[in-house]
Curated annotation (Swiss-Prot):
Expressed by the venom gland. GO terms for biological process: proteolysis. It is an enzyme of class 3 (hydrolase). Belongs to the peptidase S1 family. Snake venom subfamily. Glycans are attached at residues 44, 103, 117, 121, 154, 251. This is Snake venom serine protease 3. One of its GO terms (molecular function) is serine-type endopeptidase activity.
Length: 258
């Protein structure tokens, strides 16, 4: 555990040297230590880092492009430099995809469900987040969080996770920005039209939380981050709830939604 913790500290503090691009929170503030109990850190020794969400004691939900060799998973982390007594470390026992983790041809299949090698114990800083019971409404105010960059394009990275409030926007706005997106997809378009707040490099795989439920997974966005009228893309978790719950129930051959 000590070795894993030291490695995680180095990764979080040296994210600017990471080999893989992902998303981070711009324009937010330090998350309250008790508001991100479901937020997990995915990392390896090569410098890859992503976020994820604990959805029950045995499963984490994240983005497919966050798959990495020799993945380690940390739960209950708030500060990269100060250890929480209840932090827990796990390995992935099994990974489930709707699409090959290396295939980026389908915009809305960037989702990965991870079964942990051991169950997680709830604690002061660790608790699962509920899956959505319905999709978010247009205009909903939602919370995005992670250890991603807090400045862009010259990235700097925080010692603690940052949180920001953003809005669910019309899908057509994202489609106008990101050429090649289909007329309909299982993607949420979210951000602030005036810019200044959004996920950024390092936040990939982390949660978009609306009314206390996991509605989105940080998937893709602009570079530099948080540009005016350039919202980011989030996987629409509601459309995958049957797939997720079927796997958790033991049906690991369930068909991914088309």
């Amino acid at each position: 555990m000590v070795l894993i913790r030291v490695l995680a500290n180095l990764l979080i503090l040296q994210l600017s040297y990471a080999q893989k691009s992902s998303e981070l929170v711009i324009g937010g503030d330090e998350c309250n230590i008790n508001e991100h109990r479901s937020l997990v850190v995915l990392f390896n020794s090569s410098g890859v880092l992503c976020g994820g969400t604990l959805i029950n004691q045995e499963y984490v939900l994240t983005a497919a492009h966050c798959d990495m060799p020799n993945m380690q998973i940390l739960l209950g982390v708030h500060s990269a430099s100060v250890l929480n007594d209840d932090e827990q470390a796990r390995d992935p026992e099994e990974k489930y995809f709707c699409l090959s983790s290396n295939n980026d041809t389908e915009w809305d299949k960037d989702i990965m469900l991870i079964r942990l090698n051991r169950s997680v114990n709830n604690s002061v800083h660790i608790a699962p987040l509920s899956l959505p019971s319905s999709p978010p409404r247009l205009g909903s105010v939602c919370r995005v969080m992670g250890w991603g960059a807090i400045t862009s394009p010259n990235e700097t990275y925080p010692d603690v996770p940052h949180c920001a409030n953003i809005n669910i926007l019309r899908y057509s706005l994202c489609r106008a920005v990101y050429l090649g997106m289909p007329v309909q997809s299982r993607i949420l378009c979210a951000g602030i039209l005036r810019g200044g707040k959004d996920s950024c490099k390092g936040d990939s795989g982390g949660p978009l939380i609306c009314n206390g439920q996991l509605q989105g997974i940080v998937s893709a966005g602009s570079d530099p981050c948080a540009k005016p009228r350039v919202p980011n893309l989030y996987i629409k978790v509601f459309d995958y709830t049957d797939w997720i719950q079927s796997i958790i129930a033991g049906n690991t051959t369930v068909t991914c939604p088309q």
